[in-house]
C-alpha cells in the first residue's frame, strides 16, 4: 500500500492521542494500571517480551493496531508468506521465511516448489559439513581442516559472524571460524595470522561471485594458499556460496562444492540460507536445524497471531510510535550477553538497509520520517559508556534489553559467594527500572544531598524500554530473536508504504568507487574532479602515495 498513511483517520487519531498522553510519566501509567506489568507482556516460543515500560496505554495499542489495519499490514503479511512479488522495485518475491519451512511444507512460487529447493541445498550443506567435521574431508596434504574462513561482506558476513559468536559454545568438532569482510588488507592479514594453510578452508560467499570486496579478498587468500601448497590445492581449500557456476569454476573451485540461494532472499535476510555454511560447519547440521526451527516459531506467530497479541507487529508499531510521534531517531539494542556482542551491528543492516528509504513503493516521496537508527553494545559495557545520555540526556532513545536466566558460562563473584551472571542480570533489571521510574529531586534531597548538587543527580525516568528474557541462548533462541526483528522491520515498512527489500542507495557509491580507482592509481596527474573537495582529497592522497598530484 503506497497511499499517504499520514492522511488517514487512523494516523490523525494517533496524533490527537499523542497530544493527550505524550507527556504522561511511566510512574503515573503504572499507578493507573498496576496490572500492565504482567498484562503488557507476551510469550513467543522461548522469548518473554515485556513491553509494559513503554509510554503507551491500552488505548495507544488499540490505535496503533487500527493504523496497521489502515495500512493493510495483515494483507501485506499474507502476500509475503504466499510468495507474491512484494519487492516491487525489483519485481521479486520476498521469501526468507521459506528458508525455515519444515521439509513437509509446500510452497509453490512462480511454478517452483521452493521448499524442495531449500531442503535440497540444506541436505547438501549437511553432507558437506558432516564430512568436514568428521575429518573425511581433508586438505591437499591430507590433514584435517581446523579453521573455516568466511569471506563475504554485508549480509554474507554480518549474519554469520553474529550467529557464530552467539553459538560458539556449541562448537563440538574442533573447528573454529574466522570472518573477513573489509577490503582493507589489514582485515585479511589479521584473520590469516597464525593459520596453517594445510588446515584452513575458505568459504567465498557472493551470490554473483563478482562483489568487489569479496573477490579481492578471495583472490588474496588464494594467493596465500597457493604460495604454500600450489595451485592444485584450491579445490580442496575453497568452496563457494554463489549462483554463478561459470565464475566459481574460473576461480578454481569445484562447482560440486558450490551452494546456491535465490533472488527471493535478500542478503540481510540470508543467514539461514547457504550463507550460514560457516555456522553449520562449526555447530553441526542438527543444531543448525534447531536454529531454523527457532525462526519458524516466530514466523508462525507473526503469520497467525491477532495483531493485539502479535509481538513483532506490536514492537514494530511501538517503534514507529516513537519515531513518528515523539521524534525519536534511534533505538538502542542492549544484550546482557557478551555472546550477542555483534547483534546490534547485525540489526543495523537488517533495519537501516531495509527501511532507510525516502520514497514510497510507488516512487512518491514519503511524508514522514522513516527508518530507525539501531545501535548498541552489550551490558554492562554500555553502562560505562553511553547510558549517561540514556538516563539524563535530552534525546529520547527507546531501548531493547535482551537477557537470559541461565548463562553459557558462569564464575563466582569476587568474594566467592555469588554468581557473576546474577550480578550481570541485576544490572539488566536495575537499568530498565531506573530508566522507567527515575528518582525525584525530593527523594535525592531527603538523603542529605547538598541543594546545589540535587539537580545534577535527578533521574527523570520516563525512558522507554522493551525487556526480552529467555531461559538460555540456544540455536533456537537466536533464530527466534532474528525473526522477531525481521518482522518488526516489515511492519514498519508497510506502515510507511516503502519497499523494505531493495537497497538502491548502496549502488551509486560502488559505481563511483570503480570510476575513482584509476584516478587514484594512474601514473599521470589526473584531470580535475567535478568538485573541489574531492579533487583536493585525491591529489593529497596521490602525493602521500608517491604519485604525481
Curated annotation (Swiss-Prot):
The keyword Transferase does not apply. The active site is at 353 (proton donor), 384, 510. It is an enzyme of class 5 (isomerase). GO terms for biological process: gluconeogenesis; glucose 6-phosphate metabolic process; glycolytic process. Its EC number is 5.3.1.9. CDD domains: SIS_PGI_1, SIS_PGI_2. Transmembrane segments: none annotated. GO terms for cellular component: cytosol. Signal peptide: none annotated. Keywords: Cytoplasm, Gluconeogenesis, Glycolysis, Isomerase. The keyword Isomerase applies. One of its GO terms (molecular function) is carbohydrate derivative binding. Pathway: Carbohydrate biosynthesis; gluconeogenesis; Carbohydrate degradation; glycolysis; D-glyceraldehyde 3-phosphate and glycerone phosphate from D-glucose: step 2/4. It is found in: Cytoplasm. SUPFAM superfamilies: SIS domain. PROSITE patterns: P_GLUCOSE_ISOMERASE_1, P_GLUCOSE_ISOMERASE_2, P_GLUCOSE_ISOMERASE_3. It catalyses: alpha-D-glucose 6-phosphate = beta-D-fructose 6-phosphate. Its main location: cytoplasm. NCBIfam families: PRK00179.1. Catalyzes the reversible isomerization of glucose-6-phosphate to fructose-6-phosphate. Belongs to the GPI family. HAMAP family: G6P_isomerase (MF_00473). This is Glucose-6-phosphate isomerase. It comes from Mycolicibacterium smegmatis (strain ATCC 700084 / mc(2)155). The lineage of its organism: Bacteria, Bacillati, Actinomycetota, Actinomycetes, Mycobacteriales. The gene is pgi.
Amino acid at each position: 500500500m503506497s497511499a499517504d498513511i499520514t492522511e488517514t483517520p487512523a494516523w490523525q487519531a494517533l496524533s490527537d492521542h499523542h497530544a493527550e498522553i505524550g507527556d504522561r510519566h511511566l510512574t503515573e501509567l503504572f499507578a493507573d494500571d498496576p496490572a500492565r506489568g504482567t498484562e503488557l507482556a507476551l510469550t513467543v516460543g522461548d522469548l518473554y517480551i515485556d513491553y509494559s515500560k513503554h509510554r503507551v496505554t491500552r488505548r495507544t495499542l488499540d490505535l496503533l493496531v487500527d493504523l496497521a489495519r489502515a495500512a493493510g499490514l495483515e494483507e501485506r503479511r499474507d502476500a509475503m508468506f504466499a510468495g507474491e512479488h512484494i519487492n516491487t522495485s525489483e519485481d521479486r518475491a520476498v521469501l526468507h521465511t521459506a528458508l525455515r519451512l519444515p521439509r513437509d511444507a509446500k510452497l509453490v512460487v512462480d511454478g517452483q516448489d521452493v521448499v524442495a529447493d531449500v531442503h535440497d541445498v540444506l541436505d547438501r550443506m549437511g553432507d558437506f559439513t558432516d564430512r568436514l567435521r568428521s575429518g573425511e574431508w581433508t586438505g591437499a596434504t591430507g590433514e584435517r581442516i581446523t579453521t573455516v574462513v568466511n569471506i563475504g561482506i554485508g549480509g554474507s558476513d554480518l549474519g554469520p559472524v553474529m550467529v557464530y559468536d552467539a553459538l560458539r559454545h556449541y562448537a563440538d568438532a574442533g573447528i573454529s571460524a574466522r570472518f573477513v569482510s573489509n577490503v582493507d588488507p589489514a582485515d585479511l592479514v589479521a584473520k590469516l595470522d597464525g593459520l596453517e594453510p594445510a588446515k584452513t578452508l575458505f568459504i567465498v560467499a557472493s551470490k554473483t561471485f563478482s562483489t568487489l570486496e569479496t573477490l579481492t579478498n578471495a583472490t588474496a587468500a588464494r594467493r596465500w594458499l597457493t604460495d604454500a601448497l600450489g595451485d592444485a590445492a584450491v579445490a580442496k581449500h575453497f568452496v563457494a556460496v554463489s549462483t554463478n557456476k561459470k565464475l566459481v569454476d574460473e576461480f578454481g573451485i569445484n562447482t560440486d562444492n558450490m551452494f546456491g540461494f535465490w533472488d527471493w532472499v535478500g542478503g540481510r535476510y540470508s543467514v539461514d540460507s547457504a550463507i550460514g555454511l560457516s555456522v553449520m560447519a562449526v555447530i553441526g547440521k542438527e543444531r543448525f536445524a534447531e536454529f531454523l526451527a527457532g525462526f519458524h516459531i516466530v514466523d508462525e506467530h507473526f503469520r497467525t497471531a491477532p495483531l493485539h497479541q502479535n509481538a513483532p507487529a506490536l514492537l514494530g508499531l511501538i517503534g514507529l510510535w516513537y519515531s513518528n510521534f515523539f521524534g525519536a531517531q534511534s533505538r538502542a539494542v542492549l544484550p546482557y550477553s557478551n555472546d550477542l556482542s555483534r547483534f546490534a551491528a547485525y540489526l543495523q543492516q537488517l533495519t537501516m538497509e531495509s527501511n532507510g528509504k525516502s520514497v514510497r513503493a510507488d516512487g512518491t516521496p514519503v511524508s514522514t520520517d522513516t527508518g530507525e537508527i539501531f545501535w548498541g553494545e552489550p551490558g554492562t559495557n554500555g553502562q560505562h559508556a553511553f547510558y549517561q545520555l540514556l538516563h539524563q540526556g535530552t534525546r529520547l532513545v527507546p531501548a531493547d534489553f535482551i537477557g537470559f536466566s541461565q548463562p553459557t558460562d558462569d564464575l563466582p563473584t569476587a568474594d566467592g559467594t555469588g554468581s557473576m551472571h546474577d550480578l550481570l542480570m541485576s544490572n539488566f533489571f536495575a537499568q530498565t527500572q531506573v530508566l522507567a521510574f527515575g528518582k525525584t529531586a525530593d527523594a535525592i534531597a531527603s538523603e542529605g544531598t547538598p541543594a546545589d548538587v540535587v539537580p545534577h543527580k535527578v533521574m527523570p525516568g520516563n525512558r522507554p524500554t522493551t525487556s526480552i528474557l529467555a531461559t538460555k541462548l540456544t540455536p533456537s533462541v537466536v533464530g527466534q530473536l532474528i525473526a522477531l526483528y525481521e518482522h518488526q522491520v516489515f511492519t514498519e515498512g508497510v506502515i510507511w508504504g516503502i519497499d523494505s527489500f531493495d537497497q538502491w542507495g548502496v549502488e551509486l557509491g560502488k559505481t563511483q568507487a570503480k570510476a575513482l580507482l584509476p584516478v587514484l592509481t594512474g601514473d599521470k596527474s589526473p584531470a580535475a574532479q567535478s568538485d573541489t573537495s574531492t579533487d583536493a582529497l585525491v591529489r593529497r592522497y596521490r602525493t602521500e602515495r608517491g604519485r604525481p598530484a
